[in-house]
Each structure stands twice: as structure tokens, then as C-alpha cells.
């Protein structure tokens, strides 16, 4: 079984990847998207999104990292894909699933689901630009406002020469509403294709992962939000281990406050610690109290002191 850590814009950056891969057994991480418009991006853009390039495209604990590109113009997707692998990325991924209004308004992400030909052209251009021994993956949803084009979308990915396909089991319009998850549809796509299909959506624990794999027939899953709810989720999903005890979660947060974000203006940890605690509150009652304590703090040093002051031995 493979477990991949999903790309989550504004959430799963290099520091969080470092922390989560240290306490997990992820097979692969995908970066936050690199927005490609009409130019070959400077090298520094790739290094900013993925400092792991300085470590052979691996996190400090050794987990491989693949870059995700977001755009709609095949030529520029291809040129930036070529640059990415020249810099050392282990393959590239094409974002065809982001539901953000901002992203969709500029023609990227899930907007491509409306026209599978665009997905085909983009993925094909990337495949031709990247050496054959390196993977080119694509992440999609079941469609824009319905699943009517799901097979056309999947066929476009395979015919373009992609190595594997990640399918989020909802349409763009369904967003992240739990009641709409359709693992069966992912399974129908898997049966149709000859390339590996990775299931994504509503995987929160061992039981949901087993159910997803049973229904879809997939032997690989990608997890996103759940990885923040339960920091050791890949081990829960892979080995049926118990969730990380709260004292260990606090220790992880304490380490987080000690990590430095390149280019930080002093507000990084203010937003990110509060954000992570909002996810943790879904699984840990203790996180609610801590969140209430830090939510009124508005600078990184105060946040760090509040987290560091917790005596783990007394928890």
C-alpha cells in the first residue's frame, strides 16, 4: 500500500512536510502548486516552493518530493516541467483539480475539467518534456459540476502518457462535502485505465482507508486534511497504529515554532499555528483549549513562547 501526502496550498509547505514526514511513513509528497502562466519561471521560484531541492528533492527524513504545476498553456507547462526535473525534482504533477475561485478564474486547476482536451494537451506536453524514466502524474476531480466527463478526463490523462492518476472522488462544485464522496466512481476509472490510479478524499483513519480501497480497488491513497487532524495519519492508515498521543502532538508543535521560514516577515507562525490547531481540534479536545489561548496572540514570538511553555511531562 502506498500513501501520498497531498498538495494543499497555504497549508502543506516545506516546514510542515518536514515535520509530518519525520513522524510518518509517506511514500511521496507533492508540493503546493507552482503557478505557470506565460513564462519560464526563475529557478528561485522552484527553490522557494521546495527547499528540499537542496537535499536531492527529499525531505530531511528522506521522503521524495514531486513538484506540482498549475496552468493551462502546454508550451509553458512543458518548459517549466523540464526546468523542474533539471533542478532535481523526482517527476512533475499537473493540477487539474484545485477548486479555488481565484485559480479557476484564471483558467487553471479544476477549470481544465470542463475540457478534457486541455488536460490531454497539457499532460502530453509535460510528458514529452520530461525524461521517460521520471514520472508525470495528474490530479483531477470527477468533473466540474457532474461526473459525466469522468471517463473522458481519465482517458485524456492516460493517452497523454501520464505515469499515474490521482482522482479526488468529488466534482469541483461538490467541494469537500463529505456526503458526495464517490469512491465507486474512482474504482470505475481504475478499471478503465492501465496506469495506476490513486484514490483521494474522505480518508481520515484506518477504517475509511480500508473502505476506500475496498470500494475503489485502489492500492494507493492520497491524504490531505486528515494529515493535519491526525499528525501520524499515514502510520494509522498503513499499519492501523493508534493516533499520535497529545503530548507528542505538542512536541511537534513546539518543534514547528523553532523552524524558520525563508522570507518570513514575522507573521508566519501566527497564522500557521492557529491554522494547524483548527485542524487538530477535530480530533483532540485539548487542542481547543490551546487554540483559545493562542488565538488572541498576534506575533510569532508570543505564539512560540506560549507553545514552548507547555510542560509535556504534565500532560
Swiss-Prot record:
Keywords: Flavoprotein, FMN, NADP, Oxidoreductase, RNA-binding, tRNA processing, tRNA-binding. The record marks 35, 95, 176, 272, 274, 279, 295 as: Interacts with tRNA. Pfam families: Dus (PF01207). This is tRNA-dihydrouridine(16) synthase. Gene3D superfamilies: Aldolase class I, Dihydrouridine synthase, C-terminal recognition domain. The keyword Electron transport does not apply. Catalyzes the synthesis of 5,6-dihydrouridine (D), a modified base found in the D-loop of most tRNAs, via the reduction of the C5-C6 double bond in target uridines. Specifically modifies U16 in tRNAs. The active site is at 98 (proton donor). CDD domains: DUS_like_FMN. It comes from the Bacteria. It catalyses: 5,6-dihydrouridine(16) in tRNA + NADP(+) = uridine(16) in tRNA + NADPH + H(+); 5,6-dihydrouridine(16) in tRNA + NAD(+) = uridine(16) in tRNA + NADH + H(+). It is an enzyme of class 1 (oxidoreductase). SUPFAM superfamilies: FMN-linked oxidoreductases (SSF51395). Belongs to the Dus family. DusC subfamily. FMN binds at residues 7-9, 68, 139, 200-202, 224-225. Its cofactor is FMN. InterPro entries: Aldolase_TIM, DUS-like_FMN-bd, DUS_fam, DusC, DusC_C, tRNA_hU_synthase_CS. One of its GO terms (molecular function) is flavin adenine dinucleotide binding. Its EC number is 1.3.1.-.
Amino acid at each position: 500500500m502506498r500513501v501520498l501526502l497531498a498538495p494543499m496550498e497555504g497549508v502543506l509547505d516545506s516546514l510542515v512536510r518536514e515535520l509530518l514526514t519525520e513522524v510518518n511513513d509517506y511514500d511521496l509528497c507533492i508540493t503546493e502548486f507552482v503557478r505557470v502562466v506565460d513564462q519560464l519561471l526563475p529557478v528561485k521560484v522552484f527553490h522557494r516552493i521546495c527547499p528540499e531541492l537542496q537535499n536531492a528533492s527529499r525531505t530531511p527524513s528522506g521522503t521524495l518530493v514531486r513538484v506540482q504545476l498549475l496552468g493551462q498553456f502546454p508550451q509553458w507547462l512543458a518548459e517549466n516541467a523540464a526546468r523542474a526535473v533539471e533542478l532535481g525534482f523526482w517527476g512533475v504533477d499537473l493540477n487539474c483539480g484545485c477548486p479555488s475561485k481565484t485559480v479557476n478564474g484564471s483558467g487553471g486547476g479544476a477549470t481544465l475539467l470542463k475540457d478534457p482536451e486541455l488536460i490531454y494537451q497539457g499532460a502530453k506536453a509535460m510528458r514529452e518534456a520530461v525524461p521517460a524514466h521520471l514520472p508525470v502524474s495528474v490530479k483531477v476531480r470527477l468533473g466540474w459540476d457532474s461526473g459525466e466527463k469522468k471517463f473522458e478526463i481519465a482517458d485524456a490523462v492516460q493517452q497523454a502518457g501520464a505515469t499515474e492518476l490521482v482522482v479526488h472522488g468529488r466534482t469541483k462544485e461538490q467541494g469537500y462535502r463529505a456526503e458526495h464522496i464517490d469512491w465507486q466512481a474512482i474504482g470505475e476509472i481504475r478499471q478503465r485505465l492501465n496506469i495506476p490510479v490513486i484514490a483521494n478524499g474522505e480518508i481520515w483513519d484506518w477504517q475509511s482507508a480500508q473502505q476506500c480501497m475496498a470500494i475503489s480497488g485502489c492500492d494507493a491513497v492520497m491524504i490531505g486534511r486528515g494529515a493535519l487532524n491526525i499528525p501520524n495519519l499515514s502510520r494509522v492508515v498503513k499499519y492501523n497504529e493508534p493516533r499520535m498521543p497529545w503530548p507528542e502532538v505538542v512536541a511537534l508543535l513546539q518543534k514547528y515554532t523553532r523552524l524558520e521560514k525563508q522570507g518570513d516577515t514575522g507573521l508566519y507562525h501566527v497564522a500557521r499555528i492557529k491554522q494547524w490547531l483548527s485542524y487538530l481540534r477535530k480530533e483532540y479536545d485539548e487542542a481547543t483549549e490551546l487554540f483559545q489561548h493562542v488565538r488572541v496572540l498576534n506575533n510569532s514570538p508570543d505564539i512560540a513562547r506560549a507553545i514552548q511553555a507547555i510542560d509535556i511531562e504534565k500532560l
